[in-house]
């Protein structure tokens, strides 16, 4: 079967930069699915994306579908002919629908009887006739929240589309998509190269676009060029470029012909906290800041131009001119804000609602202060400093700097607290209270910061659940999922001895009657344990391991984590499968017994050697493992319990648990209950799958 490379390119208005990769990847995935559905063989789909185009290139695409044999079953032979042997209306109608006579039908014998069947070879359709509809379907499935119309057309897309090119090798694929007919026209860079040109073969893409149109359509090549160029430029400045992945992606999506340039700003602005300057450079201007080898911000930045100028100095000066007023604003806000202490802004928080039913940000700050003190006392942090940090935690929200540059909340609180001569761990806590801000983010360092970060998150969780506004579906306006997982990460990774029931109860109590949900503590704890489960699954922990631990509902996250790790390790042991099965058997036996078990095993009633051995080993394990369980050393404990496998197997092979003698039966059930209780101190391993 002959093959050719296939190209499709849509020339558009500027596409949303933050969505460009997602759109291109979805286009490739959708089109690949269409090819597979149509049974068209190929050797891979590559996507291209630039600000004004989306394109796909399919390698070695078959020129037609493979021929295939179809088989259409008709009525049963018994129903296909009447007593005289003539075709019934059912048989005649079926044959007509398939374009044959009844006599031309084959017969298919099955264990349920004989049936009429029509077999035919169907020739595969030419690929070029299928491609337009497949491409249209792939485009229709793109993640476009708000499609737009343009001109007098009724078609919709994320941005207006001006060109469509579909080539199967050298052949122009005839078809219409989004109101445009396919043509050989490709548009180049808006200001460089040829405005538009013709492409004669799919293999010429993207090289011809690069040569004639001055557009680097390969997204990954463009991204790598920008990253390497920015790093080299920073090195020439004697520094290191701050190339955040999300910003690199956005800049890559904004330019078709990247040109790396460096610029400077006045050193006087370095008196302003670096975070505020960086926010302006990254967030507003899409610049890459530069730091020296000690992590100090330099008065330089790197930016990416979308045009190769004969006079790059003009472009550099233009960017310096644009950023200067923003840096001046930051300088003004910083100097103005320092005239008033953070503490003096506490009262103004009373003018800002946290949530209508839950009070103001001042109310929240007071609760966080009390909650921080409660947590600090339990984890060995400075209670006075934790209280102070909690009280000041939201004061920077009332500063000019944070009102203008909202992403600087927390970090500006830290700088202002230092200016006010607050204790250093108080100042640091004001910044770190929001950590972790996203998956994989750093955690608070000091214990005071941990106390405030946990207090803030638990206050939000208890309050929002307390008024019955738990997250539903994808809607989570108060970021409760992030708050829950952040709290759990801090407790587990910092190994803090906190019980969720205790801290959530305290958080709910501090609302002092403002919340109406009486089951708020249970709901928040269950919600947090649910997030725990999800995070472990994402980390690759087996579901049955998580279920085995959840069955015990441990509410100390650090303890929960230790159990999960222990059960994961236990699951790898040779004895695990047999002991899990034995525990399941024990659970079933005990579940059917509705009487009262004895407090202890009566040695005099142990008749069979197998039950005597098991009783001795269980008693020995109870003594040996008590300190291990008390110290949370579950992995060591479960490893020791694996040694019971032989005794347990022999017991079930030799001993009739449900003996006719009531005393013997009760004694054996008590022995099994003690065996089960040993394992349950870690997890319910009966839930482990084979």
Curated annotation (Swiss-Prot):
InterPro entries: DALR_anticod-bd (IPR008909), Gly-tRNA-synth_bsu (IPR015944), Gly-tRNA-synth_heterodimer (IPR006194)
UniProt cross-references to Gene3D superfamilies, sorted A to Z: Isoleucyl-tRNA Synthetase, Domain 1
EC number: 6.1.1.14
Superkingdom of this protein's organism: Bacteria
Pfam family, one: tRNA_synt_2f
Top EC class of this enzyme: ligase
Oligomer status and interactors: Tetramer of two alpha and two beta subunits.
Family note: Belongs to the class-II aminoacyl-tRNA synthetase family.
NCBIfam families: glyS
HAMAP family documented for this protein: Gly_tRNA_synth_beta (MF_00255)
Protein name from the UniProt record: Glycine--tRNA ligase beta subunit
Organism: Tolumonas auensis (strain DSM 9187 / NBRC 110442 / TA 4)
Organismal lineage: Bacteria, Pseudomonadati, Pseudomonadota, Gammaproteobacteria, Aeromonadales
């Amino acid at each position: 079967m002959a093959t050719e490379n296939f190209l499709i390119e849509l020339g558009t208005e500027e596409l949303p930069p933050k969505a460009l990769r997602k759109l291109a990847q979805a286009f490739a995935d959708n089109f690949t699915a269409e090819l597979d559905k149509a049974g068209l063989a190929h050797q891979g789909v590559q996507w291209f994306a630039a600000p004004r185009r989306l394109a796909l290139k399919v390698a070695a695409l078959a020129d037609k579908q493979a021929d295939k044999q179809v088989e259409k079953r008709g009525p049963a032979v018994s129903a296909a002919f009447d007593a005289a042997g003539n075709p019934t209306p059912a048989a005649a109608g079926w044959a007509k629908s398939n374009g044959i006579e009844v006599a031309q039908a084959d017969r298919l014998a099955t264990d349920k009887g004989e049936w009429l069947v029509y077999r035919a070879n169907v020739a595969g359709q030419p690929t070029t006739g299928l491609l337009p509809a497949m491409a249209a379907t792939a485009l229709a499935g793109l993640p476009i929240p708000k499609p737009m119309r343009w001109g007098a057309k009724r078609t919709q897309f994320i941005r207006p589309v001006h060109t469509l090119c579909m080539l199967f090798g050298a052949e122009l694929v005839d078809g219409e998509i989004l109101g445009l007919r396919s043509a050989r026209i490709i548009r180049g860079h808006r200001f460089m190269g040829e405005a538009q040109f013709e492409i004669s073969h799919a293999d010429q893409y993207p090289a011809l676009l690069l040569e004639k149109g001055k557009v680097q359509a390969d997204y990954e090549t463009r991204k790598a060029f920008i990253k390497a160029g920015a790093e080299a430029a920073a090195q020439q400045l004697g520094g290191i470029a701050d190339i955040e992945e999300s910003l690199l992606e956005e800049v890559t999506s904004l330019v078709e012909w990247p040109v790396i340039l460096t610029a400077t700003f006045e050193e006087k602005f370095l008196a302003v906290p670096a975070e505020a300057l960086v926010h302006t450079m990254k967030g507003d201007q899409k610049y890459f800041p530069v730091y020296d080898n000690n992590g100090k911000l330099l008065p330089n930045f790197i930016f990416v131009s979308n045009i190769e100028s004969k006079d790059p100095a003009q472009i550099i000066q233009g960017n310096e001119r644009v950023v200067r007023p923003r840096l001046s604003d930051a300088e003004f806000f910083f100097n103005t804000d320092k005239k008033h202490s953070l503490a003096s802004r506490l009262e103004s928080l009373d003018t800002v609602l946290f949530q209508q039913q839950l009070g103001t940000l001042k109310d929240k700050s007071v609760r966080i202060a009390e909650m921080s003190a409660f947590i600090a006392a339990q984890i060995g942090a400075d209670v006075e400093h934790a209280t102070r940090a909690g009280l000041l935690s939201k004061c920077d929200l009332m500063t000019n700097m944070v009102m203008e540059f909202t992403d600087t909340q927390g970090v500006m609180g830290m700088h202002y607290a230092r200016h006010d001569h607050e204790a250093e761990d108080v100042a640091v806590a004001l910044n770190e209270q929001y950590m972790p801000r996203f998956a994989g983010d750093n955690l608070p360092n000091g214990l005071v910061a941990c106390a405030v970060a946990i207090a803030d998150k638990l206050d939000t969780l208890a309050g929002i659940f307390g008024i019955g506004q738990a997250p539903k579906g994808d809607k989570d306006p108060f970021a409760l999922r992030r708050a829950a997982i952040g709290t759990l990460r801090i407790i587990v990774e910092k190994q803090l001895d906190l019980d969720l029931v205790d801290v959530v109860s305290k958080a709910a109590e501090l609302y002092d009657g403002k919340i109406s949900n009486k089951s708020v503590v249970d709901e928040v704890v269950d919600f947090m344990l649910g997030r725990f489960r999800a995070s472990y699954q994402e980390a690759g922990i087996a579901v049955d391991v998580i279920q085995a631990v959840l069955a015990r509902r441990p509410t100390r996250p650090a303890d929960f984590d230790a159990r999960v790790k222990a059960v994961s390790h236990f699951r790898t042991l040779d004895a695990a499968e047999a002991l899990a099965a034995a525990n399941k058997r024990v659970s079933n036996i005990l579940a059917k017994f509705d009487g009262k078990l004895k407090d202890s095993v009566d040695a005099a009633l142990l008749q069979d050697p197998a039950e005597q051995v098991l009783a001795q080993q269980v008693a020995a394990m109870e003594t040996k493992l008590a300190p291990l369980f008390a110290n949370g050393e579950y992995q060591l404990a479960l490893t020791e319990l694996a040694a019971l496998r032989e005794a347990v197997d022999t017991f079930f092979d030799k001993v009739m648990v449900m003996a006719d003698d009531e005393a013997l039966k009760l004694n054996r059930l008590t022995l099994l209950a003690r065996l089960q209780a040993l394992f349950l101190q870690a997890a319910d391993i009966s839930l482990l799958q084979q």
